[in-house]
Structures are given as C-alpha cells and as structure tokens.
Amino acid sequence: MDLDIKEIVKNMDLKFRNIEGKKLLLAISTDKSGKVLMTAFMSEESLEKSIETGFMHYYSTSRDKLWRKGEESGNVQKIINVFRDCDGDALLFTVEQTGWACHEGYMSCFHNKIDLSTGKSTVVGNKLD
C-alpha cells in the first residue's frame, strides 16, 4: 500500500519551527562522501515536493518562496537518502550533486575558512566552471 506524500511527511515526525513567520526546518545536503554542500530551510511544501520529485526543493526566506535547487543554474540535487535529527527539526540529505552547490560557483557553500584568532576568512577551494 503506497502512502500519499502528506502521510509520508506526517510519519517523519518533524517539528517545523517558526522562522520569520513561516514554519520551517533546517535542511543540510551532503554528497556521498559526507562533504557538506549547503544548508537551507525547508517548508512542509518544499519537503513534499522533494519527496514527490526526488530532487531537492527548499524555501527561500529572502525571496519568500519555494524553489527547486538548480532551477536557474541546472545544478540540481538528486536525493539518495535522508536522516532526521534527534529533535526532528533538521534533516540531513545525501544527494547526487550536478555541477556545484554554491550559487557563488564553489562545490560547497562552506568555502570560507575562518581564522578564530582574527575572525577573518580565507577562501579555500576553487570556483568551478
């Protein structure tokens, strides 16, 4: 018996938090090696769309809308698996990344290494073409 998408999300026992007036949770995406690619917020609707399509959808607080990762760049994230954290307010996705994950052209959004003695950051890694 196949469950509908809303029932699947309900069974995930998630705790969406009130962030900027929206019910959201944190989504972390990693590649198969475990390297963190990016973090973003998800609404219930973006989670449902991700499950339905097999590709990552997020909720942009700055644009106040749902968006499919790669809708402009073509750098999509195909879902391999997902883990829920112990509190139910964050999801960790393993994805197959097409192209780069960061909108600045880096594989990971975490390319700014911070020196804790100065607070200054240095870019590590190269931009991808």
From Swiss-Prot:
Short name of one Pfam family: PRA-CH
Record carries keyword Magnesium: yes
Residue sites binding Zn(2+) per the record: 86, 102, 109
GO biological process: L-histidine biosynthetic process
Listed cofactors: Mg(2+); Zn(2+)
Main subcellular localisation: cytoplasm
Details of cofactor binding: Binds 1 Mg(2+) ion per subunit.
UniProt catalytic activity: 1-(5-phospho-beta-D-ribosyl)-5'-AMP + H2O = 1-(5-phospho-beta-D-ribosyl)-5-[(5-phospho-beta-D-ribosylamino)methylideneamino]imidazole-4-carboxamide
Gene3D superfamilies, per database record: Phosphoribosyl-AMP cyclohydrolase
Keywords linked to the UniProt accession: Amino-acid biosynthesis, Cytoplasm, Histidine biosynthesis, Hydrolase, Magnesium, Metal-binding, Zinc
EC number per UniProt: 3.5.4.19
Superkingdom of the source species: Archaea
Binding site for Mg(2+): 85, 87, 89
Annotated GO MF terms: magnesium ion binding; phosphoribosyl-AMP cyclohydrolase activity; zinc ion binding
GO cellular component: cytoplasm
Subcellular location: Cytoplasm
Pathway annotation from the record: Amino-acid biosynthesis; L-histidine biosynthesis; L-histidine from 5-phospho-alpha-D-ribose 1-diphosphate: step 3/9
Enzyme class at the top of the EC tree: hydrolase
Oligomeric form and interacting partners: Homodimer.
Entry similarity comment: Belongs to the PRA-CH family.
PANTHER family membership: HISTIDINE BIOSYNTHESIS BIFUNCTIONAL PROTEIN, HISTIDINE BIOSYNTHESIS BIFUNCTIONAL PROTEIN HIS7
Role of this protein: Catalyzes the hydrolysis of the adenine ring of phosphoribosyl-AMP.
The protein, known as: Phosphoribosyl-AMP cyclohydrolase
